[in-house]
Amino acid sequence: MADNIYAGSAPADAPANRGWLLGHFMPAGDLRHSEEVEIKWGVHPRGDRRAQWVTGESRAALIILVSGRFRIEFPHRSVVLANPGDYVVFERVEHSWYAEEESVIVGVRWPSIPGYAVPLRPGEK
């Protein structure tokens, strides 16, 4: 990375970091380290659900559907992303999600701050 360029493949790189491609959790000095924004390539099998609700949320997020059918759940409503390119933006809202079909999403969150990771499920890396 001496030329300040990193080229990768989201499907290949994402599994090493639970889907995350960029954020505070990448090693300092890595071009993918950022305290400003986080980017995720999320691949979710049908029926996959966030293990627990995000509470005390202080960040904003943009979720874009690449393929599948993906539901973002909020305290008083849900938004279903059903067509490629459908998206939702939210800020400081508690939420969860559910993959109604096998889905691929791109998630962007800002700022990138520690403390929101869900504990790993048994057998998860």
Report each predicted region and the residues it spans:
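Short acidic-glycine-tyrosine-enriched beta hairpin
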Residues: H76-E94
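A short, N-terminal "cap"/entry segment at the start of jelly-roll beta-barrel domains
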Residues: M1-R46, R50-W53, R121-K125
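Short, conserved beta-strand element in jelly-roll/cupin
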Residues: T55-I72
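A structure-centric signal for secondary-structure junctions around beta-strands
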Residues: E36-E38, R59, E102
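Short histidine-centered beta-strand/loop micro-motifs
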Residues: D30-H33, R50-E57, F74, V80-L81, ...
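Short beta-strand His + acidic residue motifs that chelate non-heme Fe in jelly-roll/DSBH
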Residues: A51-Q52, I72-E73, F90, H95-E101, ...
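Double-stranded beta-helix
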Residues: D3-N4, Y98-K125
